[in-house]
């Protein structure tokens, strides 16, 4: 009797361990992963705070946004190669947003994570919104959709990705 109880307990433990492992998300990463963070005026609360979350495109237009909002808002950035679907993106958002209150959050995430399907991307989108809302419940949110590539010498070669971008933006 005791032996059968022990076997039963071991079987439940093994089943539970396998079940938990099956639900573990394996990130689909690029060959090189990167993160770039800029948090200016962290000890100053005279102006509203804006956070730009995105990739290298966001990092590219950050200086212009910062210049346009000079004297009106402090502009911070979290730019990363992480994509929706990668739990590390949510961790990065939580970390950066823990540094202070943000009044507006502008986010654009879509040109990385090609290994994630559109269904995986769609399923992960609410998690990003929840993370932003958890850290900045009263912030205004701006979602910048990913711009499809429609012209240029690479257009034909990128046709499949452009179709995926359009689907992700819907």
Question: Where would I find each of the regions flagged by the language model?
Answer:
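Alpha-helical cap/lid subdomain in secreted, periplasmic
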Residues: 1-3, 68, 88-170
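N-terminal secretory targeting modules
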Residues: 1-52, 58-74, 94, 98-100, ...
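Short, glycine/acidic-enriched loop or turn micro-motifs at the edges of active sites
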Residues: 57-58, 111
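Second-shell loop/turn segments in exported
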Residues: 48-52, 78-82, 112-118, 156
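A short beta-strand-loop structural module common to alpha/beta enzyme folds
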Residues: 72-88
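A mature extracytoplasmic/lumenal domain signature
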Residues: 56-57, 69, 79, 145-147
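Flexible, glycine-rich phosphate/dinucleotide-binding loops
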Residues: 59, 84, 150
């Amino acid at each position: 009797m005791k032996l059968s109880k022990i076997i039963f307990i071991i079987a439940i433990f093994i089943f539970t361990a396998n079940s938990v492992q099956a639900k573990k998300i394996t990130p689909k990463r690029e060959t090189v992963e990167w993160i770039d963070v800029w948090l200016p005026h962290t000890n100053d609360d005279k102006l509203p705070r804006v956070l730009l979350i995105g990739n290298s495109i966001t990092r590219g237009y950050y200086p212009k946004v910062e210049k346009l909002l000079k004297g009106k808002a402090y502009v911070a950035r979290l730019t990363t190669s992480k994509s929706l679907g990668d739990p590390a993106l949510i961790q990065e958002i939580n970390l950066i947003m823990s540094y202070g209150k943000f009044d507006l959050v502008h986010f654009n995430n879509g040109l990385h994570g090609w290994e994630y399907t559109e269904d995986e991307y769609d399923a992960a989108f609410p998690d990003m919104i929840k993370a932003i809302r958890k850290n900045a419940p009263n912030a205004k949110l701006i979602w910048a959709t990913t711009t499809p590539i429609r012209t240029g010498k690479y257009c034909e070669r990128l046709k499949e990705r452009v179709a995926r971008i359009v689907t992700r933006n819907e």
